Amino acid sequence: MLIPKENRKAIHQALFSQGVLVAKKDFNLPKHPEVGVPNLQVIKACQSLDSRGYLKTRYNWGWFYYTLTNEGVEYLREYLHLPAEVVPATHKRQVRPTAPRAGRPEPRERASADAGYRRAEKKDEGAAPSGFAPSFRGGFGRPQ
């Protein structure tokens, strides 16, 4: 499908900035909500990138989910003339705040009454006698 260069560039920029793109399976939708180009052009451009191995496509409940592969990141970086330091949002490490370790209270010891029931010694009261030999005799009134 022939897609104007500015539309193709807008699709590639949106895909590279986030690393993922979602498109509704509606070929008659006048504009894609995120990119601003016709939805058919978004789907076909992503289909083209998928056939070359630059995207992974998932389809679920009427929506296409496109995810960039590592080869796709390299291809779009070259296509959009971006430096190697620029990466999609999905490839960036998220910095999580660490909780302070010093503020935690020490674990308390269990009460002695609690320890007696938790660590009771095991007894062999429930074992069968040494001469016990079970045998199968049929069952439920069936002949042997």
Swiss-Prot record:
- GO CC terms: cytosol; cytosolic small ribosomal subunit
Going by the entry's taxonomy, the superkingdom of the source organism is recorded as Eukaryota
What InterPro entries does the record tag this protein with? Plectin_eS10_N, Ribosomal_eS10, WH-like_DNA-bd_sf
**GO molecular function terms attached to this record:** RNA binding; structural constituent of ribosome
The residue ranges flagged as biased composition, category Basic and acidic residues, are 103-126
Keywords carried by this UniProt record: Cytoplasm, Ribonucleoprotein, Ribosomal protein
Pfam families found in the cross-reference section: S10_plectin
List, in alphabetical order, the GO biological process terms annotated in this UniProt record.
cytoplasmic translation
- Map out region (Disordered) in residue numbers: 90-144
- What does this gene product do? Component of the ribosome, a large ribonucleoprotein complex responsible for the synthesis of proteins in the cell. The small ribosomal subunit (SSU) binds messenger RNAs (mRNAs) and translates the encoded message by selecting cognate aminoacyl-transfer RNA (tRNA) molecules. The large subunit (LSU) contains the ribosomal catalytic site termed the peptidyl transferase center (PTC), which catalyzes the formation of peptide bonds, thereby polymerizing the amino acids delivered by tRNAs into a polypeptide chain.
Q: Which family does it belong to?
A: Belongs to the eukaryotic ribosomal protein eS10 family.
Q: Quote the subunit structure annotation.
A: Component of the small ribosomal subunit (SSU). Mature yeast ribosomes consist of a small (40S) and a large (60S) subunit. The 40S small subunit contains 1 molecule of ribosomal RNA (18S rRNA) and at least 33 different proteins. The large 60S subunit contains 3 rRNA molecules (25S, 5.8S and 5S rRNA) and at least 46 different proteins. eS10 interacts with GCN1 (via middle region); this interaction is direct and promotes GCN2 kinase activity.
Q: Output this protein's name.
A: Small ribosomal subunit protein eS10A
